[in-house]
């Protein structure tokens, strides 16, 4: 697995992956966002917005997904990842998250990174729980962040958080 800066050349492959019914449904994407043009707009957005750090996830030379830190502030950010369905359950999510979280905590020096998912997206919530360094269901502690992701998704969500110290302690054990 390797992470690369976004490039408009990846739009066609990105569109093919987000067009997969299971991926489109899990992300709650409208039809116009899974087109090649929609992928180009996404790439433009994440490469021009200073409050985002986004990378294309590759296996060799094959685009398999995207990982993004969004709403980056002095202390926190939100992380989101998606993979093409054929890459689910193969460890790519954990590997990509570890790399981007290391950047968030070691380079950006954030204190916490939020991860969340729609409550119906059991697969994503289970994947987050499996990481070991995630504190699950913290919406009551961070209600504004929970409201933010629920406004974006338009549905009930579960908010989780990765605290810098927990992540770095887990990495040190490896």
Where are these regions (language model features)?
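Acyl-donor (CoA/ACP) binding surface of acyl/acetyltransferases
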Residues: 1-21, 56-174
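Conserved GNAT-fold acetyl-CoA-binding loop/helix
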Residues: 22-43
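A short helix-loop-beta-strand connector motif used in the catalytic cores of GNAT acetyltransferases and
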Residues: 43-56, 65
């Amino acid at each position: 697995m390797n992470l690369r800066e976004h490039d408009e050349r990846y739009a066609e492959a990105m569109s093919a992956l987000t067009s997969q019914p299971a991926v489109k449904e899990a992300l709650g994407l409208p039809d116009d966002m899974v087109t090649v043009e929609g992928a180009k707009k996404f790439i433009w957005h994440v490469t021009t917005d200073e409050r985002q750090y986004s990378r294309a996830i590759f296996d060799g030379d094959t685009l398999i997904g995207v990982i993004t830190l969004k709403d980056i502030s002095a202390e926190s950010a939100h992380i989101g990842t998606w993979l093409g369905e054929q890459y689910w359950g193969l460890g790519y999510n954990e590997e990509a998250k570890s790399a981007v979280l290391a950047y968030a905590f070691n380079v950006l020096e954030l204190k916490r990174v939020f991860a969340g998912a729609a409550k119906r997206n059991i697969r994503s919530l289970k994947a987050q729980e499996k990481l070991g360094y995630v504190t699950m269901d913290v919406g009551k502690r961070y209600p504004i962040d929970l409201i933010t992701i629920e406004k974006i998704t338009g549905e009930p969500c579960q908010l989780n958080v990765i605290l810098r110290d927990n992540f770095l302690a887990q990495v040190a054990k490896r």
